[in-house]
Regions:
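NAD(P)+-binding Rossmann beta1-loop-alpha1 motif at the extreme N-terminus of oxidoreductases
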Residues: 1-53
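Residues at the starts of beta-strands that form the adenosine-phosphate
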Residues: 2, 25-27, 110, 137, ...
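Hydrophobic/aromatic beta-strand patches that form the interior of the parallel beta-sheet core
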Residues: 29-31, 51, 89, 112, ...
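Short beta->alpha hinge that forms the Motif I/post-I loop of the SAM-binding pocket
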Residues: 33-34, 66, 91-93
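Short, well-ordered alpha-helix to beta-strand connector turns
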Residues: 47, 59, 85, 135-136, ...
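Rossmann-like NAD(P)-binding element
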Residues: 53-82, 86-89
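Rossmann-like NAD(P)(H) cofactor-binding subdomain of soluble oxidoreductases
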Residues: 77-126
Length: 197
């Protein structure tokens, strides 16, 4: 299986490490704008080869692990480059804008909108760890728009690395994630205000 990871940090790096552990005959190709990250990922054995978008035609699976603010511009180009049997999924923390951007793309059926809820405070290839996703929730949005055989391919990987799967629509996902991510800030603010009073 040819797995491409675009953005080799904590999430993308950890995911391909787990895929390599769970499956035989996996070759991981890395695409990254930061050459130092590519070199580090090669040295650490996270990826097997450096690649470019032109190589995406070889991919069986593409993991897009880049900042959400550039996903809208990059995902259409990524989908343009892949073959019909390749599943592309992102790991971004927001979904509505990404799903809206891709709704009329000719290869929308190749895309699966995902948000694995996992992480640490570290970043970069050296932050990648084994078993980051074990027993963690992966929220999938608009699953019905992805070709069934490609859903199956992705779900096989998610289950192999220990993820629990949940389904939501993109707007509800973003609303719930916004509430949860701001809850700690609100709690800290209110606690601080209480102490001051």
């Amino acid at each position: 299986m040819n797995v491409f990871v675009i953005g080799i940090g904590l999430i993308g790096g950890s995911l391909v490490k787990d895929i390599k552990s769970a499956f035989d005959n996996v070759t991981v190709y890395g695409i990254e704008s930061n050459e130092a990250n590519i070199a580090e990922a090669l040295t650490l054995g996270i990826i097997d080869q450096k690649a470019t978008y032109q190589d995406l035609q070889l991919a069986d699976m593409v993991i897009v692990s880049i900042p959400v603010d550039v996903m809208g511009t990059e995902l259409p180009s990524i989908l343009d480059a892949v073959n019909e049997d390749c599943v592309v999924f992102d790991v971004g923390s927001t979904k509505a804008l990404i799903c809206k951007t891709l709704e009329n793309h000719p290869k929308r059926r190749n895309f699966l909108a995902c948000h694995p809820i996992a992480g640490t405070e570290f970043s970069g290839p050296s932050a990648a760890i084994n078993n980051l996703f074990k027993d963690k929730t992966n929220i999938i949005c608009e699953v019905e728009l992805t070709a069934f055989k490609l859903q199956e391919k992705a779900l096989k990987v998610f289950q192999a690395v220990g993820m629990r799967i949940r389904y939501m629509n993109p707007v509800a996902h973003d609303k719930h994630i916004a509430y949860v991510s701001h809850l700690s800030h609100i709690s800290a603010f209110m606690l601080g205000k209480t102490v001051i009073e």
